């Protein structure tokens, strides 16, 4: 009876407001209701759909206390033309409160060319640091204790080479490999789907990735062996649901490759991590982050029969959306980044890079990157968003959007499974990056 009464009131409300609503067009993305009520989450079961923070299905977060126990890592992505310049920026960020490093490499490094190769002409040091030798890597981390800082390296096709260099530099510093903390992106499938910086065909590339899984599980156990990346997929034009669907489909492919190579699910799954994009639609993004955790946990438990809770936890890094920055009126980008930061924090990110206001124009100035870092610090210490775990949990709108994004993502994953998985979807051209026409 209560539901019937609510339905009647809602119908009357919508009829009364129809003319006003018609003046405001729908925004892109999933279809939104004008107002949300308990009717939008009928069948909702708290323990099944949400649970306690830090417990399966991890909708509310992968840690029981989330930011009340420890804030997210403030990991600013940076890379200048030379190792010396990049080292200077890394040290500046650490001195100003950055709690992790994130290395950007130039395109020749990303696709395995030395700077003196003719194929590298015109691209050396343009979008990141050029690393050709072990000496370059030593300079990059000069006066930075690799035993005390965690480092993320955005490197894919030659990930094994850059990781080997990093381990060698740490050994020279006296830091054993089993004490190193950090992440290599190492996500080659999204290169075929969204970026195009690959070296080898898909299947040989998958072998390199599973070799890294196995090596690190035995020798660098604190290292995150992959950052399965939806960020680039979103930047290439996907929706929120497609971002998590295509990325989780890639994650399934990596797991299947590792299992086929003889590894056991709980020996490596706990070190798989993800990388999401934060766009401007704050509440939709929060719902996306929550849906991704629940979907991954369900897949690991029901499809791959993981036993260790760590294997089911989707831990993720977030970067604010580069595609949302404008070259015109760049100071407005500060506000955009602040909104995206709030979305990432309310969505439960483990680490965060905030873009600088001028990145649509050039590498960020020192002043701009300081503002970007301070944005995180203000949200962390002054907004109150870090005081409550999953502050939007229970919202009719957020729970309904979480369900809708998860359902749409599941449908895409089903389609990819029918093709034989992400590798086959790429080989068939269904999930494949094509360069935009000039």
What do the predicted segments below correspond to?
Residues 1-8, 106-109, 390-399, 403, ...:
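Often metal-dependent polyanion-binding catalytic scaffolds in large enzymes
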Residues 122-126, 192-199, 235-237, 276-281, ...:
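Short beta-alpha connecting loops at secondary-structure transitions
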Residues 133, 375, 394:
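Residue-level signature of catalytic and energy-coupling elements of molecular machines
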């Amino acid at each position: 009876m209560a539901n019937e009464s609510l339905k009647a009131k809602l119908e009357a409300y919508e009829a009364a407001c129809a003319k006003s609503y018609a003046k405001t067009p729908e925004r892109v993305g999933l279809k939104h209701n004008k107002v949300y009520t308990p009717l939008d989450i009928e069948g909702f079961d708290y323990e099944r759909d949400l649970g306690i923070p830090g417990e399966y299905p991890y909708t509310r977060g992968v840690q029981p206390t989330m930011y009340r126990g420890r804030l997210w890592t403030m990991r600013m992505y940076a890379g200048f033309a030379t190792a010396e310049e990049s080292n200077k920026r890394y040290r500046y960020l650490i001195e100003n409160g950055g709690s992790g490093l994130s290395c950007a490499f130039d395109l020749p490094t990303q696709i395995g060319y030395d700077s003196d190769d003719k194929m590298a002409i015109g691209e050396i040091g343009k979008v990141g640091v050029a690393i050709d030798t072990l000496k370059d890597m030593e300079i990059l981390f000069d006066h930075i204790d690799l035993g005390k800082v965690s480092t993320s390296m955005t490197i894919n096709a030659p990930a094994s080479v850059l990781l080997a260099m990093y381990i060698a530099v740490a050994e020279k510093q006296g830091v054993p490999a089993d004490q190193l903390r950090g992440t290599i992106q190492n996500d080659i499938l999204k290169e075929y789907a969204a970026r195009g910086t690959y070296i080898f065909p898909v299947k040989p590339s998958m072998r390199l990735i599973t070799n890294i899984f196995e090596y690190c599980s035995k020798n660098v156990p604190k290292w995150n062996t992959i950052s399965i990346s939806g960020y680039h997929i979103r930047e290439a034009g996907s929706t929120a649901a497609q971002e998590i669907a295509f990325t989780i489909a890639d994650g399934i492919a990596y797991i299947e490759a590792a299992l086929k190579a003889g590894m056991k699910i709980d020996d490596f799954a706990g070190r798989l991590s993800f990388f999401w994009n934060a766009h401007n639609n704050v509440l939709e993004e929060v719902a996306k982050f929550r849906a991704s955790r629940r979907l991954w946990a369900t897949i690991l438990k029901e499809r791959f029969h993981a036993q260790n809770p760590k294997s089911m936890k989707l831990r993720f890094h977030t970067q604010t959306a580069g595609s949302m920055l404008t070259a015109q009126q760049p100071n407005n980008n500060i506000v955009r980044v602040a909104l995206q930061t709030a979305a990432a924090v309310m969505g439960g990110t483990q680490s965060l890079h905030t873009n600088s206001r001028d990145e649509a124009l050039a590498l960020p100035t020192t002043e701009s990157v300081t503002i970007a870092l301070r944005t995180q610090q203000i949200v962390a210490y002054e907004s109150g968003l870090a005081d409550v775990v999953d502050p939007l949990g229970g919202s009719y709108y957020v729970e309904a959007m979480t369900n809708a994004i998860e359902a749409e993502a599941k449908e895409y994953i089903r389609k990819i499974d029918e093709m034989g998985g992400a590798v086959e979807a790429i080989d068939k051209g269904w999930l494949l990056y094509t360069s935009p026409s000039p």
